[in-house]
Design a protein with these regions (language model features):
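ABC-family P-loop ATPase nucleotide-binding domains
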Residues: 13-15, 23-29, 65-126, 130-136, ...
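Walker B catalytic motif
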Residues: 140-149
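Conserved catalytic loops of ABC-family nucleotide-binding domains
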Residues: 160-173, 177, 181
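Conserved catalytic segment of ABC-fold P-loop ATPases
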Residues: 183-191
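Conserved small/polar residues in nucleotide/adenosyl-binding loops
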Residues: 195-201
Length: 201
């Protein structure tokens, strides 16, 4: 699958814009293009990873893979209820608590708090638990493991992958952290820095 991205904005000519162009030999900043060849066609996969530095095009590429909006881990939470009541409210209780534990949110008192009062890391993991329980057919998650410390990120990536592989659906994770690759064991990886892709053997 080839994903093409082209962003365009006005070519500004303010004093500062002109000075930046002159000082740094930058003709303009109004065009940004990227073409990425993702190894997804003909591959039976569940987890894909797009990795690269900030500004390398991960979000732009990810938002075009399925033609659907990026899954928002932080939207749609009821601030008047604990997160354990917000995740799959009509679903199985054990599936919800199992998902919370599986994504690394094992601090049970946090389950009894509403989403807005959680830490950034807890919010991220609660969002992953909701994703696991909702189990959409296809989803793209941006900033995967960006707001949690690196050791928890590695273990959490492995735990998420193990949980996700138990069910159906395809998920593409976007991350600036290369250290999660061996823990996540994705079916394919696209590196925005090297413009390369690899599928798992």
């Amino acid at each position: 699958m080839i994903v093409k991205v082209k962003h365009h904005c006005s070519d500004f000519n303010s004093y500062r814009a002109a000075r930046v162009k002159s000082l740094f030999n930058a003709e303009n900043g109004c065009d940004w293009e990227r073409s990425a060849e993702l190894p997804v066609e003909g591959l039976d996969w569940k987890i894909g990873l797009i990795v690269g530095l900030s500004g390398s095009g991960k979000t732009s590429i990810g938002s075009r893979i399925f033609g659907e909006p990026i899954y928002d881990l932080y939207a749609g939470w009821d601030a008047t209820k604990p997160i354990v009541d917000c995740i799959a409210p009509d679903g199985d209780f054990n599936a919800v608590t199992g998902a919370l534990s599986a994504v690394g949110l094992g601090d049970v008192p946090a389950w009894l708090r509403p989403f807005p009062v959680l830490s950034n890391g807890e919010k991220f993991r609660a969002g992953l638990a909701r994703l696991v329980c909702e189990r959409p057919k296809r989803a793209v998650v941006d900033e995967f493991t960006s707001v949690i410390d690196r050791q928890i990120a590695k273990v959490g990536a492995a735990a998420f992958a193990k949980t996700w592989r138990k069910g159906d659906g395809q998920v593409v994770l976007l991350s600036c952290h290369y250290d999660i690759i061996e823990w996540l064991q994705p079916d394919w990886v696209y590196d925005c820095l090297l413009y390369t892709s690899d599928a798992a053997d």
